[in-house]
């Protein structure tokens, strides 16, 4: 059930076609989870500042049942910051990513939970 959310001040017109699919496929490879369970949500055009500047920035979160931890998170940070830099032109030092290891009983899907 990985869910990756990107809140950014980058305009919608600057989000390339296929970006959501690319994020999904990269997360499939990085996390070893099936694409059918991965959700990606990009929220452009946000009123945001990072370090007092309104230059392009992003505040992100990655939620998952398992596959969250120190070494894994460093790997995800490298991958995701790289994609955001390349595709949205956001400098990696203007990106925060929060990681959440979810309890399966606290994640609802398809009329039930993952527990």
UniProtKB/Swiss-Prot annotation:
Keywords: Acetylation, Cytokine, Cytoplasm, Immunity, Inflammatory response, Innate immunity, Isomerase, Secreted. One of its GO terms (biological process) is positive regulation of cAMP/PKA signal transduction. GO terms for cellular component: cell surface; cytosol; extracellular space; nucleoplasm; plasma membrane. This is Macrophage migration inhibitory factor. Substrate binds at residues 33, 65, 98. It is found in: Secreted; Cytoplasm. The lineage of its organism: Eukaryota, Metazoa, Chordata, Craniata, Vertebrata. The gene is MIF. Homotrimer. Interacts with CXCR2 extracellular domain. Interacts with the CD74 extracellular domain, USO1, COPS5 and BNIPL. Its EC number is 5.3.2.1, 5.3.3.12.
